[in-house]
């Protein structure tokens, strides 16, 4: 998995069923950790670290907040 991938938390996580977008890949650390942004309606974005064991790949995000089109 890489930055801007859409993931869903599985049953191993308290956020199970929630969708998020990988914001950072801390691939150089061991174990590998991902910073995942989970949009919360009317509240903004919560950021959660996960080692990849409780997320499943859904797809690639096309529009990502903070990115500009070239």
Stretch-by-stretch model annotation:
Residues 1, 28-29:
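Intrinsically disordered, low-complexity regulatory regions enriched in Ser/Pro/Gly/Thr
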Residues 1-13, 19:
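Short coil-to-beta transition motif at edge beta-strands of beta-rich domains
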Residues 8, 21, 35-39:
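Short, acidic/hydrophobic/Gly-rich beta-strand patch recurrent on exposed beta strands
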Residues 13, 26, 40-42:
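Solvent-exposed strand-loop boundary residues in beta-sheet-rich modules
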Residues 16-26:
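Short beta-strand-centered aromatic/proline hotspots
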Residues 30-36, 45:
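Short aromatic-glycine-enriched beta-strand elements
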Residues 39-70:
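Intrinsically disordered, low-complexity, charged/polar segments
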